[in-house]
Amino acid sequence: MINFSSLLRIVKSLKTTQWQILAGPILILMILSMMVLPLAPFVLDVFFTFNIALSIIILLVSMFTRHTLEFTAFPTILLFSTLLRLALNVASTRVIFLRGHTGTNSAGRVIESFGHFLVGGNFAIGIVVFIILVIINFIVITKGASRIAEVGARFILDAMPGKQMAIDADLNAGLIGEEKAKKRRIKITQEADFYGSMDGASKFVRGDAIAGILIMVINIFGGLIIGLIQHHMFLNKAVEVYTLLTIGDGLVAQIPALVISTAAGVIVTRVSSNQNVGEQMASQLFYNPQVILLSAIVLGVLGLVPGMPNIIFLVFTVLLFILSWWLYEKKYDLENDFIKSNKKYKFIHDAISEASWNDVELEDPIRIEIGYKLTPMTDINKKGDLLDRIRIVRKKVAQEIGFLPPLVRIKNNMHLSGNSYRIFIKGVEVGQGKCFYGRFMAIHSGRETESLPFEKVYEPTFGLSGYWIDEEFKNKAQKKGYSVIESSVVLSTHLNFLITNHIDDLFGRQEAQQLLERVTIDHPKLTEDLIPNTINLTIFHKILRNLLLEHVPIRDMRTILETLSEHADTQKDPNELTSIVRIALRKIIIQKLFNQNNIIEIIGLEPNLERLLLNSLKSGTDTIEPNLSENLLIQTKEAIKKQLLIGSPLVLLVRHSLRYFLSKFLRQNFPELTVLSQFEIIDVKEIKMTNIIGTS
């Protein structure tokens, strides 16, 4: 009995199969099969037609390619197309020898048509045309393309060290980021690989041209021998049939070869720009109307020479005159527009008033720049809820951290792509991403059963993979186990993450003053006794900023103020006062890191390493010896990896005297690592050392 559910599963799996992965192996198997298996004339027609279509596609792709690296698969495609032609030659030779005695249609309609129509059925003309095509392909196009690829590869390899140094210089100067530097290095490597591959791949085409001549000779003489001896044909009939079939076979293979060789020449001779080959040629050939005018005059003079085809020359002369006039008018209009715009600018410039302090734009504490397609997210009339989401983010940060972050300014940026956005904190870009208004992001949750028919993307906050899906797919994605969220939630979550990570940058003196005024309402006596009588606002701001730098909430202002009131008389150093306040806030710190766990799993320091670090501190240099510093960073990195594997918080426990020093040192490389002192965990019942950082 047929199991229909199994059949449905098979059909469904076929739909989800990525067939493009199998294209290469299928093509190779097809080529090998053609070399081994005898093919019917109709099948041979299909493959010859496919070969012609493939060559045309390759040529058009090379013409419309704007940059060489957009078609890096070309050398491999060149190899496959050459193998395909040779396999077709083998298959057609087999058919010609087996069935050639039956007539000129024995090897299929394509070969017969090329033999009859293109050369008029005259085998002498066919041989000459075939040899000319081979010479053009072998000596002119392929040899030139091969030489260009060889020289290009050599120049690119010679220039690689200089380009790498330029990238390193830009990276060190801060002109580009690590990600962009990596992309530029990959691009340089790909260019060298491409031209090196093209240098080798062009040898395939040259070999194919030589093979074409040899195959033609073998086919003619082999066909004559078979026709005369085995099939007892008359000499003139055998010459007519086998020569015609051989010429048709050679032409139907060499014309696509010539087309692909032309594509190879186009690829290696083009200069990378934002225009394709046609646009480059048109814009540069017809840029200057004077050149076209002089060409028309020369052509007109030649057309007046007796014996010349005067009408044809004069027609082209008139066409060039018209083209020259049109280009001149176009250039004149552009110059007029430029002059008018300059006059308009001068008029506006003259009308502009003198610069004043009102022209100075102060940097926004938090700014989001959005592309034009995201503007509906801010429009309440279009049901945009981004502004509400941002209000929720600010309230959430205020409730969790303990102070209200500054207002968020949203600005349209026409230079961004439509769906892009960038987030700035104090003028520095701290994050970017893409959102699609009106669509939803389906994020992998670990419970999903199958993929979705959309392009795979990564959400900008945590780098989780997912898809931007249309609204009608929302329920379907949820049923498959995906977490589906709105586009405004994606952006607001990213904003919340970045504000939390840069919270210390957002806490300025003004925020400290506002927070103090808010606390004064509930605890007036505490604030009056402490500020400015004991410590000034600058020290108070520095202490709170130190806490925020290590992601310690400052909600419990009563404890903070009482601790400062108790110790600020004898201690004025903000860093020392911060350490004292941290001990007072230890329960909040532990709860934030470990929730309500009775057992905490942390990273520890080996006693020998602690002693070496203490000696560095006592020497008064506040620096670590280079070898020790490198070893400490390596071992900390390994300890963090192990801590992540067991799913424990990234917490390092050290002596109180080392805590501030190590926290400052390790924060540069491991911002996610929290450093605690032994005085901050005195309330913990049980401590488990999961990893030890040592001296070796």
From Swiss-Prot:
Transmembrane residue ranges: 24-44, 45-65, 71-91, 121-141, 209-229, 247-267, 281-301, 302-322
Localization terms from the record: Cell membrane
Keyword Transferase: no
Pfam family, one: FHIPEP
Top-rank taxon, per record: Bacteria
Keyword annotations from UniProtKB, A to Z: Bacterial flagellum biogenesis, Bacterial flagellum protein export, Cell membrane, Membrane, Protein transport, Transmembrane, Transmembrane helix, Transport
Membrane-topology annotation of the record: Multi-pass membrane protein
An annotated GO BP: bacterial-type flagellum assembly
GO cellular component, one term: plasma membrane
Record-linked InterPro entries: FHIPEP_1 (IPR042194), FHIPEP_3 (IPR042193), FHIPEP_4 (IPR042196), FHIPEP_CS (IPR025505), FlhA (IPR006301), T3SS_FHIPEP (IPR001712)
Cited function: Required for formation of the rod structure of the flagellar apparatus. Together with FliI and FliH, may constitute the export apparatus of flagellin.
Family assignment from sequence similarity: Belongs to the FHIPEP (flagella/HR/invasion proteins export pore) family.
NCBIfam families recorded: FlhA
Protein name: Flagellar biosynthesis protein FlhA
